[in-house]
Amino acid sequence: MSAAPVSGSVFADLEPLLPRVSKPVQYVGGELNAQIKDWDAATVRWALMYPDAYEVGLPNQGLMILYEILNERADALAERCYAVWPDLEALMREHGVPAFTVDSHRPLGAFDLMGVSFSTELGYTNLLTALDLAGIPLHAADRDT
């Protein structure tokens, strides 16, 4: 497996895993109204997470409004992230693929900020799983910034 650059796409490492999971389409992105902005042109890069399955989080209006507002700004970039199902989580751990956004498949750790929209407390453990998959320390004191 090739190691992706810190801010580069992990799709080359993710794609071979997709035939081995249920509903792989939820991880490929490219939906109507999805936005992929120039990474280098953005001053601030947001990863917006809905910590539940793609089909639950995609229609969330709050997350989509924030996604649109941030991407309307010339200085900002926002991409979406959802919880992965256990089948892909196991493969990601086995193959060293970090948690990623569905828009450009960049690792969550490459973003400046991470926003999370919870609809229930059940999403808390999914956030912890995503942080762990991303290699982001759970405790703020253990992070660089």
Question: Where would I find each of the regions flagged by the language model?
Answer:
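A short, structured N-terminal alpha-helical element that caps or precedes a catalytic domain
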Residues: 1-145
